[in-house]
């Protein structure tokens, strides 16, 4: 009978230690997840900006990087010089 009480006490102590260490580890992991979530939402809102405000061309065309403004419309994005 005394052995089962000791086993229960040891298990209870082990559970208590695990719960205390999990409480100190989890906040840093949740902080990292919230940082990633804010980066994702910032990227999503940046994708909703109007075309007139975007100066950078599509990355599908690696030759063109920025509009050169040679057509007197600096934000048209049709002609570029690298």
UniProtKB/Swiss-Prot annotation:
Q: Do you know which InterPro entries this protein is assigned to?
A: Hepcidin
Q: Which GO terms describe its cellular component?
A: extracellular space
Compartments where found? Secreted
Keyword terms, alphabetized: Antibiotic, Antimicrobial, Cleavage on pair of basic residues, Disulfide bond, Hormone, Secreted, Signal
Q: Where is the signal peptide?
A: 1-23
- Is the keyword Secreted assigned to this protein? yes
Describe its assembly: Interacts with SLC40A1; this interaction promotes SLC40A1 rapid ubiquitination.
Function, in words: Liver-produced hormone that constitutes the main circulating regulator of iron absorption and distribution across tissues. Acts by promoting endocytosis and degradation of ferroportin/SLC40A1, leading to the retention of iron in iron-exporting cells and decreased flow of iron into plasma. Controls the major flows of iron into plasma: absorption of dietary iron in the intestine, recycling of iron by macrophages, which phagocytose old erythrocytes and other cells, and mobilization of stored iron from hepatocytes. Has strong antimicrobial activity against E.coli ML35P N.cinerea and weaker against S.epidermidis, S.aureus and group b streptococcus bacteria. Active against the fungus C.albicans. No activity against P.aeruginosa.
Which protein, by its recorded name, is this?
Hepcidin
């Amino acid at each position: 009978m005394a052995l089962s009480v000791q086993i229960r006490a040891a298990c209870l102590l082990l559970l208590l230690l695990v719960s205390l260490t999990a409480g100190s580890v989890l906040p840093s992991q949740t902080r990292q997840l919230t940082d990633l979530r804010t980066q994702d939402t910032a990227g999503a809102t940046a994708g909703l900006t109007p075309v007139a405000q975007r100066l950078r061309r599509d990355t599908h065309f690696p030759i063109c990087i920025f509009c050169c403004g040679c057509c007197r419309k600096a934000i048209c994005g049709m002609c570029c010089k690298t």
